[in-house]
């Protein structure tokens, strides 16, 4: 027996026939999806050409079958659907790679959606049946049409014209299909089985499309309100409205449904309407037409697309056969007023408004009750920008047309050439739609974005000038007079340095150059916002063109904050202190600095590196809030590193600041944002600290040791100013804040624990940064070890020796091993542990750490640092284990 082949019924009038048709179309679409752009464009052009040539017979068919509209206008619609749509998209890429940027590693690839279900309205049957298949062909989709029962013949005929031309040009057979005997059940089936729905029709049909469970591109009802402002060109306005409202007897959904005219020009507007052949209904006639517009609360289908005279006759009114529009002068914009509804015919409501605001209020109500999201129009002198902006702000419509006939203007590319041509006009969320623009080819493709991994642009930012060497301060300051010609200098320092004559060399040099100066020396060890504000107030009175901040990190930080407040008195520290993941992508834009004053930083200790960093910390003593500011606008313009200013630093300061330098360099080297530039600075700083910190600690008068430690501090500062720090500093910041330990000591107490933590080859989470490809911190630490002469069989062995060498360094400078040894009360430490941990996790430094921390892991580091490695009490371990579960 011969095998029975599946056949597709020639007439689609049953669910079974439709199922077979859809299956065949999906197979055709799979073939079509492989076509090149050149093949598609050939098909697109052939189909558009055929539709254009058939525009007149198709227009005749539409009027004959539906009994609506005007043949000549439908010819224009068909012509528009073919020619304008082709012209708009002939050069648009819709196949394969449509966009590529090799520099940024982005490629966009267009793919067809599949099978489109197209619901076609009775008002624009042939033009819509040209438009939708054309954009489907351009996007390599199959399209199956569900025609309106009252327009099925002409709709199918239009689709056939497009299909036959497409197939002849190489398209797969059956790429366009239709239901021959349309019904609600078959339409629902089409919508369920298609991949996307293009729904144009009444509110019920559009709602069904959105309720089908498939993506839908539908439109909402139009109730276009027009306002004629008293500045408008009356002849232009009236004749544009007539031109639009009479086009195809008002069946374009964007056509005007009401016109609101300002009282001052109402009479002239009315006269122009009359002169151009419109008819104003008398009071008794108004009531008759009202009863004709709506039947049982719904639009009377019999008036749709009919001539004005025909509608008048239906209402029992006699008007000239040449009457263009029936105009009803009404007052209410409420839905109880029949004239306030969409009428899809040459029937127009006309309102009078005393003011422009009243006109807008009427238009708003008309849109809200019947045309949310669709179209509105305004006739006005375009120099009236304020009125135009007010109108645009008030109208919840996706098309706001200025001095434009709304039927022809709304569909696009006729009166504005950036509004894309379409016969499916999206109304946005206001109209219950998924799109708020004219639907086109971009809505019928899926775009795949291929994103190649790219690494961030990195940078090296330093002060414009860095001067260093013992005794260089007065020489560097020469530039203020000889090069920059500064006139007034403001010095910022603390009281100890001022009273002990540290600023005298600066003051003497300024006097020698004839530069007027003053000194603010009330900076506290933990600089406060109050003292910074006081300093800034003094600056504003003195009006310096140069600021010199001299001291440790506190004085330099305070100087930076005063600089900000001096140049930007309204600076918001809450915003400036916002955390960031990438300093170049932060939400807050720092104010540009340097407009009023040049900033010079002069360190008196070897530790913070603040003279070359874009960081500052300020505390609001009234609230206890610390604001850590970070932005390259805070980078000093000049740094002067003169060892003469550091020779008398006591042992405690030398120890704490020296180990801070080591921590800066270690964290900068391990940071995810480390680069070849910062690596060199960090490694050299580490070598110098190992070699010279013990000497500087043992003998403060050792000039060579002091000089090298000053250089190490500055280089480590440059390194972490660009590579940033990590959780070592996050933990130390909070340890110091909660338990009042010197910052450098706090860093030292967690240092070895953090290094072990970061060196894990299998971390719970690695940090996120494109340059950081995989956990390799152990190898980085081993590189540091080898750079200072350590050897071993593997990275782990070298790392262990590095830890040992660091411990020996800290022992040499007499840093204790645990937090507990510094007298921090155990009970209070444990009470603050959770809060400390959370704040450390949220610290700005955490983001660049190579291992992204869990809070439980940070807590464990704190406990190890308090009790010592391996000395955490068993009771505490059990408690932590229980809380972690």
Regions found by a protein language model. Name each.
Residues 97-236:
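Rossmann-like NAD(P) dinucleotide-binding subdomain of oxidoreductase/dehydrogenase enzymes
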Residues 738, 745-831, 871-872, 876:
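Gly/Pro-rich interdomain helix-loop hinge
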